[in-house]
């Protein structure tokens, strides 16, 4: 970027072809940087989400989660900000006369939770299907870095998908009981 700035300073006329080409080159580099930054932010958010789920699963557990356990874990994930929201509400109740001090943080939390709940109920949260033994093993082997998140195969885990998995597991259990 500094080389571009130096070259722009050398240009004599602001409407010359060289000046326009350098401006175009600068905009292109800026746009590339924005795209890279967007990918980095997304992988950081996904990495934090996966590390939260990994931290909630028992260390010694080798068998995959049952669909009901995964649904309970997702519901627990939705309550991860409850303590912080309680603290904000407590601070607001103490000083009624002051302006809402933590309104921005509270709004971000509520919007995030609303978006995630809506995703879970409709299309699905971008997560690893922890009901699959191979994906659970991949999550266990993950080093926790945001750079390696892109190598993990993520699924869209939705409420409807978990209901289908529950029905399949019930059918499987009943067929096994019929055989014995």
UniProtKB/Swiss-Prot annotation:
Positions of the UniProt region annotated as Disordered = 1-32
List, as start-end ranges, the regions of compositional bias called Basic and acidic residues: 1-12
Q: Name one GO cellular component term.
A: nucleus
Task: Indicate, by first and last residue, each region the UniProt record lists as having compositional bias (Basic residues).
Answer: 13-32
Pfam families (UniProt xref): Tma16
Family as reported in the entry's similarity comment? Belongs to the TMA16 family.
Q: Can you say what this protein is called?
A: Translation machinery-associated protein 16 homolog
Which taxonomic lineage is given here? Eukaryota, Metazoa, Ecdysozoa, Arthropoda, Hexapoda
